[in-house]
Amino acid sequence: MIAAISLMRRRDDVTLTAFRRHWLDVHGPLVCRFPGLRHYVQDHVIASPAMNAQAQGLHIDGFPILCFADDRERLHAHSSAEMAACNVDSRAFVGAVSRVICEPQVAVSPTVAVARTKLIALLAGEAADDAALARYAAWARGLPRLIGLVLYRVLQQGPAPASTIAHLPVSTAGLAEVAFASLVDLECAMAGVVTDAAHFVVEEHSLM
């Protein structure tokens, strides 16, 4: 499985409410038309004391995660007419974007069917660092009331290809998706945590 994850910042002249509604109601259905798309979620960043200073400084509003069977399917989708339509629509609400192509690895299988409250961790670093990702996973496994953990090993990252949206100059050594049953569980687990990873609290919307 290959995951294409975008780091999205909304346009300065678009309110957070308008950004969320357009992303969910207009852009989301366009993405669902991609050939070969196996799974698609939108992770909407929400305000929380568990969101640390590193994350706040990046001003990221959302993380779309698109999964394909392999890189051939991903490249086919990214060169499709459906992707071209999405690139045009993105101009209406996205101000800057970066894309990270990853190999997802389930480190802790979800213990409940649906977990919509999650922590997205961007590990500090200019390039992929599998050892750092493994260390983060070992630490995250010890969090109280953890119900799921997915690691995203970085294969490539940079500007979104064929996009006319400005590039968001953010790099990462790896990503982790840490799931909890509730926002209360997440915030209690992260209270007092000190890390150089950027921690974003997100609400997940599954579209496919």
Positions of the model-derived regions?
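Macromolecular interaction modules
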Residues: 1-208
